[in-house]
Amino acid sequence: MKLYSINTGYFKLDGGAMFGVVPKSMWNKINPADENNLCSWALRCLLIEDGNRLILIDNGNGDKQDAKFFKHYYLHGDDTLDKSLAKYGFHRDNITDAFLTHLHFDHCGGSINREGDKLVPAFKNAPYWSNRAHWDGAVHPNDREKASF
């Protein structure tokens, strides 16, 4: 079995929202905030090569949303899912299983691609795996989490 770290880019979120009750004086040392209290976060996935299976755990935020959506997240960096897969000699069509830890946009937004006016699965040779609780939460989100879907 081989494991690969797959970086799909970076985005920014409010440090206080991410670290909660942990004082800024502590978290700011390891993840410094900018002038708007935003911290950079890696959109990193895990690729598992096991025999003839290539399992992708999460897939980043993708690019199907519009500019209005993404302007809130300050996307930066040159990494993409396709570039990171290619670095190890793989293509998205090689993925045999797409596992989603949960259904927030930054973990599963790359599951679907826009082709013209249609949305199509990004991994055409892979079933998608998650669980019922996450599906129900995404379809019927609570007020606190609905912006994440």
Named regions from a protein language model:
Residues M1-K2:
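Extreme N-terminal starter segment of soluble prokaryotic enzymes
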Residues C108-K118:
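Metal-dependent catalytic neighborhoods of phosphoester/phosphodiester hydrolases
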Residues I55-I57, F99, Y128:
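Residue-level marker for buried hydrophobic side chains located in beta-strands
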Residues G9-K87:
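Conserved beta-strand hairpin/beta-sheet module of binuclear metal-dependent hydrolase folds
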Residues N61, F105, H134:
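Short, glycine/acidic-enriched loop or turn micro-motifs at the edges of active sites
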Residues H76-D79, S84-F90, N94-D106, A122-F149:
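Metallo-beta-lactamase
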Residues A67-K68, G110-I112, V139-D143:
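A short secondary-structure junction signal
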